Amino acid sequence: FSAGHDIGTPGRDFHRSFDRRTLWYDHTNKAGAEKAYAREQEVYLGMCKRWRALPKPTIAQVHGGCIAGGLMLAWVCDLIIASDDAFFQDPVLQMGIPGVEYFAHCHELNPRIAKEFLFLGERMSAERAYQMGMVNRVVPRTDLIDEVRRVTDRLSAQPRLALQLAKQACNHMETLSGKEAGMDAAFGYHHFAHANNTIVKGDYIAGFDGKKMAEANKAQAEKSD
């Protein structure tokens, strides 16, 4: 039961000191799996979900490489506009992890294309991403900023509430199709992989570290060229 005054009465008890506790993860210094789980639940998956739920439309302006964490930040936006030299990639399988924390691959791409994207870890060009429906528009690099501004000007001229409700409706449809439930399940698999890597390799990341992965990606790109 709460009478409302349980949260404090202005002018009466504001002077009292309380031992304040946060209801959300606020630590990354605990032992074992809790450290990685708390950090990635809050900073990666949780943050991305909150960005996706913003009432205002968001646009990702992408040029160059959009890799791993960058991919998550682009995916949470409502629209993605990319330059023709942009590419997208989730290579973290090489680190012994089954994909980034915000696991939206099979909603952003056809499942078979998503599997190829994950299994091989290769770069997907902006044009290919556009063909697959992951990107809204591809323009020359020199035109990217102007194109994004044109779209934002159009959006700002739309009725605000209708735009907000349209976004909520689209997000709700995605949620009903299982997007969030799937991501939550994939997050569990992600941390099972971390735990397995810790037991087998002594580190929660197995295979390549960030530096080695960057070198491998560069070599792969040069070979493709």
Feature roles, as predicted:
Residues 19-23, 42-43, 76-79, 97-100, ...:
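A broad, low-specificity signal for short, low-complexity segments enriched in glycine/proline
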Residues 1-46, 212:
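Glycine- (often His-adjacent) and acidic-residue-rich active-site loop
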